[in-house]
Swiss-Prot record:
Zn(2+) binds at residues 70, 72, 85, 88. One of its GO terms (molecular function) is DNA-directed RNA polymerase activity. SUPFAM superfamilies: beta and beta-prime subunits of DNA dependent RNA-polymerase. Belongs to the RNA polymerase beta' chain family. RpoC1 subfamily. Pfam families: RNA_pol_Rpb1_1, RNA_pol_Rpb1_2, RNA_pol_Rpb1_3. This is DNA-directed RNA polymerase subunit beta'. Its EC number is 2.7.7.6. The keyword Cytoplasm does not apply. Keywords: Chloroplast, DNA-directed RNA polymerase, Magnesium, Metal-binding, Nucleotidyltransferase, Plastid, Transcription, Transferase, Zinc. It comes from Gracilaria tenuistipitata var. liui. Mg(2+) binds at residues 472, 474, 476. InterPro entries: DNA-dir_RpoC1_gamma, DNA-dir_RpoC_beta_prime, RNA_pol_asu, RNA_pol_N, RNA_pol_Rpb1_1, RNA_pol_Rpb1_3, RNA_pol_Rpb1_3_sf, RNA_pol_Rpb1_clamp_domain.
Amino acid sequence: MTKFDHHFDYVKISLASPSKIRSWGERTLPNGQIVGEVTKPETINYRTLKPEMDGLFCERIFGPVKDWECHCGKYKRFRYKGVVCERCGVEVTESKVRRHRMAYIELAAPVTHVWYLKGTTSYIALALDLTVKDLEKIVYFHSYVVINPGNYHKLNYKQLLEGYEWRNLEEKLSSHSSNIFGIEVGIGAEAIYKLLDNINLQNTVEILREESLRPPKLFKNPSTKFNKKMKRLRLLENFLATGANPSWMVLSVIPVIPPDLRPMVQLDGGRFATADLNEFYRRIINRNNRLARLKAILAPEIIIRNEKRMLQEAVDSLMDNGRRGRTVIGANNRPLKSLSDIIEGKQGRFRQNLLGKRVDYSGRSVIVVGPNLKLHQCGLPKEMALELFQPFVIHRLILQGLVNNIKAAKKIIQRNEVVVWTVLQEVIYGHPVLLNRAPTLHRLGIQAFEPILVEGRAIKLHPLVCPAFNADFDGDQMAVHVPLSLEAQAEARLLMLAPHNFLSPATGQPILMPSQDMVLGCYYLTTYNPAAISDSSHYFSNLDDALMAYQQNNITLHSLVWVRFSGLVNDSSNQMVISSKLNIDGTITKIFSDRIVKYDNDGQMVVQYIRTTAGRILFNKAIRESLL
């Protein structure tokens, strides 16, 4: 790993100037020679299988292919470390420098950066206050643009001219009687470069700030023009704040990434497989060299212009293949991967390699429903648990004196001896694990559970925590992480355990709510059969007797029965007495719709029967047991 001499607080991404890009790749050799510019499209010599000098894999620019050995073989071994071969100019050093040494291509004509030209917001168009359509006409050589109108009153600054309009104007300018002078008209990225370079950031920002103080009268619905001015003001202020020049959005130097990040490998049949980026760089160098040659021989303007357009398209495809124009495809009709394709998306450099690193003590498997689990539990497959907790198991085996060393412990683990599962059960007791389902969109996307060993290879998940994870059981996968330190375990238990996260952080509403089959089951258990209302002639002395009658099939789950109940009944909604009866012993029996109550002479309740079903008794019993 590279060690930095200087500490830093943050990384800032900003526009790079042409001199900055050159400084990334330029190095001065001890003999005073400056290397870093790639001028040849060749990669390797197919006869010697060595990189071509000044090519895309040049050892003089990027460093040696073999450790401590120069290109020509004059210097070999570590003792020549730091020596630069006077014959081939290669520095004797480690080959891993080819992973970070860069180079550059000096362009014969400037080109625009496609990200700033054709992005979601075209920053070049915004900076110049032009439409994207007009900008593309200029860049791709369809229209001319006025850079300086001179003293000709019919021309305006940044006005677009078609080819025939410019030819007519040229005829006027070339005539001897013409008194028009100072006109400057351009086309292509060179014209855009001049327009961007002409922007006086300080003055333009001050003018836009004054205009921002006088917004349109309909302030609630500002015009599109006003919004665009505000966006332009923000952009130019950012240029001022970062010290960047808008003209840097037009490239005159292309950086070349290190060769080991775009490798070329030999296959079994003698053929070579190469990274797609090499093809893009090769096209750019070929077109660039051809353009330089055409300029040198003073070729006609139309030919040079066509070559500039082709160079622009080659650079566009390197930056973002297919963003504009025809997609460059490889030998097997597959679109070549550009720099944007390598960086962006789920499989890109950021999400796949930088944010999505593999970590130890973690696993992944399909989830299945575990309705018999407690809310704070999850079912962990035995094989996975043994692999995740292996260091803990080995430590416990040695502590208990069952083995003497780690090697012996690993052997009995491989043999799946019974003692291993006993020790594993002891190890996981009280040790929470973290379950995570991607994408983790809020803090409830990762929660802690106590693991329960289960057979099979699927992780069992309590159905009530599914809404928090946005999980379902149609093939979803979840990751398991083991908190190792005592601090991490305590945090998982106190803050991240599933029962501690039953409110949604977004709304404050409960997120652990029964749904679907649970609601249907509760409804089915507590409903009654309307047809059996007239046949509710069964009386039971207590709740257990009613359940026993249900188990012996004397009553159904939904049959209405009368059960003696001594507890408090909250039935304020139905207090209307249907009938009242005076008994021989002086007691009074009052019959309500769902209760029969017997009172003594003093008005005290003697006995109470409630009308219910076996299903409701079961439901009440389950809730009561869970609360106790």
